[in-house]
């Protein structure tokens, strides 16, 4: 059996680097305006509805197709 040679090394320095990287990103962020928030919410809602509609169409096809083929 092949042994894994990967040994993760977590050090205080590597943890500090990750925290600094996250803080740098957080400093660049800002609160979205109401208009930006509404636009993002609308786009996300349309995406969710589209995925649901596609799933429903696939469900209907998979349940109705065997009945159509059997006739």
From Swiss-Prot:
Keyword Transport: yes
Entry-linked InterPro entries: Prot_translocase_SecE_dom_sf (IPR023391), Translocase_Sec61-g (IPR008158), Translocase_SecE/Sec61-g (IPR001901)
Keywords in alphabetical order: Cell membrane, Membrane, Protein transport, Translocation, Transmembrane, Transmembrane helix, Transport
Top-level lineage group: Archaea
SUPFAM superfamilies cross-referenced by the UniProt entry: Preprotein translocase SecE subunit
One function term, GO molecular function aspect: protein transmembrane transporter activity
Major localisation: membrane
Residues spanning the membrane: 43-63
Presence of keyword Transport: yes
Subcellular location: Cell membrane
Short name of any one Pfam family annotated for the protein: SecE
Membrane-related topology note: Single-pass membrane protein
GO cellular component: plasma membrane
GO biological process: intracellular protein transmembrane transport; protein secretion; protein targeting
Complex formation: Component of the Sec protein translocase complex. Heterotrimer consisting of SecY (alpha), SecG (beta) and SecE (gamma) subunits. The heterotrimers can form oligomers, although 1 heterotrimer is thought to be able to translocate proteins. Interacts with the ribosome. May interact with SecDF, and other proteins may be involved.
Physiological role: Essential subunit of the Sec protein translocation channel SecYEG. Clamps together the 2 halves of SecY. May contact the channel plug during translocation.
Family the entry assigns: Belongs to the SecE/SEC61-gamma family.
Entry protein name: Protein translocase subunit SecE
Organism of origin: Methanosarcina barkeri (strain Fusaro / DSM 804)
């Amino acid at each position: 059996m092949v042994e894994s040679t990967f040994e993760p090394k977590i050090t205080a320095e590597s943890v500090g680097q990750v925290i600094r990287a996250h803080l740098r990103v957080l400093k660049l962020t800002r609160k979205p305006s109401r208009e930006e928030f509404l636009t993002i919410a609308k786009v996300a809602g349309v995406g969710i509805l589209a995925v649901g509609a596609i799933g429903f169409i696939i469900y209907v096809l998979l349940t109705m197709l065997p009945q159509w083929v059997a006739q």
